[in-house]
């Protein structure tokens, strides 16, 4: 499967869309994902990492409330990307429920976060 096909596969997952921003793939999350969708998404991300795409951004600016599955899968993605010396940046709005959750759980201290105002 080539990079364009994998990008279309990711876009077919409920609630997300992908963009190429500079040298990173940005995935915009709009709603929590069911576990089945996460399996499709993780497989696609893994394939793209194997193709050498190791810089990622997860845009959470439109996500109101992530579920526990989302949080666990985000941490899984971080570890997979770091294994290939890549980087995953989480983009969120200051004061949003996602930002507050990341502060409360202290994920903000261990993950790479970019805050939009």
Predicted regions and their residues:
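STAS-typified acidic loop motif
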Residues: 3-43
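A short acidic, often aromatic-flanked loop/helix-cap motif at beta-alpha or helix-coil junctions
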Residues: 25, 58, 117
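Amphipathic alpha-helical interaction surfaces in cytosolic regulatory modules
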Residues: 32-110
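Short acidic-hydrophobic, aromatic-tinged amphipathic segments that line or gate anion-handling sites
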Residues: 109-117
